Amino acid sequence: MAKAHWHTFQVLTKRSGRLVDLAPSLSWPPNVWIGVSVENQRWVSRIDDLRKVPASIRFLSCEPLLGALDLDLQGIEWVIAGGESGHHARPMKLQWATDLRDQCLRDGVPFFFKQWGAHDKEGRRGRKKQTGRLLDGEMWNQMPNRTRVTA
């Protein structure tokens, strides 16, 4: 990945404990971003593990967003959120998405709203293209600052 410096690699895991074990043995070039999945409050502990990794960009993927989140975003450079898609998709509540966005705004963390998924903001089932990407009437496409230097 370091040799392909013109690409940005976004590596995502649910196995944050394993990530912490492996992180010291890996090189972390600035084009390798690392993230953890945080679907609901049950998985917030993954964020503490993520903070231990010396990547230039550490991010959260809150997709599918399956519950309300109360986050400490210190040391996090980006948050992605989205609803679940697929035949057995569970709906994402509007309040969960707006609360997460508001936490990002409060803490100065870029927020990217990827999709509503298989349900719209009222919880009605639809196709992803029908449910769209707007949150409170806006597209949230914020990205992290790629020039951050790790300590």
Predicted regions span which residues?
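Core AdoMet radical
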Residues: 1-67, 77-92
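Auxiliary Fe-S-binding modules of radical SAM enzymes
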Residues: 66, 70-151
